[in-house]
Design a protein with these regions (language model features):
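Short alpha-helical scaffold segments that flank and stabilize functional sites
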Residues: 17, 31, 88-90
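C-terminal edge-of-domain segments
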Residues: 1-7, 91-111
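Hydrophobic small-molecule pocket/channel-lining residues, especially in calycin-type beta-barrels
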Residues: 2-3, 12, 27, 69-82, ...
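Extreme N-terminal tail/first-helix region
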Residues: 1-20
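A short, compositionally biased
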Residues: 19-23, 64-66
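Short beta-strand segments
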Residues: 22-54, 70-72, 82
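Short, structured beta-strand-loop surface elements
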Residues: 55-103
């Protein structure tokens, strides 16, 4: 896939889809390795990162373990993007996910 930067795993179809949506489900890892999934509103940045509010449990978890994932999808027609990466706090109660891996479905003809 070609993305917005040389290291980005997001192709143009994924970027276009992420720009068209606003809500995803963010997965963080809590103490003891317990997964925690919460809906978040996100914003796609110019470099292909995703910014979102991070407070409470999300902030605690990603500060201790920055590896996170987000899924953005729709059900009719079924399509979506799953992104795995590393999150960092960029402002008070604001974090940025830098994608390392991405998977998509239903975004291209025949997929």
């Amino acid at each position: 896939m070609t993305g917005s930067s040389p290291a980005s795993p997001l192709g143009e179809a994924e970027l276009e889809y992420l720009r068209s949506q606003r809500i995803g489900r963010l997965a963080t890892v809590g103490p003891g390795g317990q997964p925690h999934v919460m809906p978040v509103m996100y914003q796609l940045t110019d470099d292909g990162s995703l910014e979102f509010d991070a407070d409470g449990i999300k902030l605690r978890n990603l500060t201790a373990e920055p590896r996170v994932a987000i899924v953005v999808d729709t059900m009719g027609p079924r399509r979506g993007v799953a992104v795995q990466g590393v999150a960092s706090v960029v402002a008070p109660e604001r974090a940025r996910l830098r994608p390392r891996r991405a998977f998509s479905w239903g975004l291209r003809p025949g997929s």
